[in-house]
Amino acid sequence: MSGKVATKKKKIDQTEIEEDYSLNDVVLRGRVSQEAIEKELPSGDKVVEFRLIITREKLSGVDTLDIGAWSSKARRIALTLTPDEWIEVSGSIHRRFWSAPTGLASRWQVEAVEITRI
């Protein structure tokens, strides 16, 4: 007898799972630029939008960022904000697309998950 052992080889579908280290998490502190505006979209969804003024570190000037409150809790809080009020917003950055008269349009917006007065 030879020392060989007969074995059946099973073909196994091995799909490599690649790790995804993505993170879309922002925390911003700044002043509310003006009163928030509630909009109803063609889909029926509601969003409350406002802008946050953030002073640049070590540079002159400010950045004004668009904030969107989509959840009912965030919308309620956003509608009570007053101009120049200091707040903290936590959430994530999203790019919104819509059809405009000139074609497809888009803009970046911070989707507020939590809004806190400071």
Name the predicted role of every residue range.
Residues S2-I118:
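Single-stranded nucleic acid-binding surfaces, predominantly the OB-fold ssDNA-binding core
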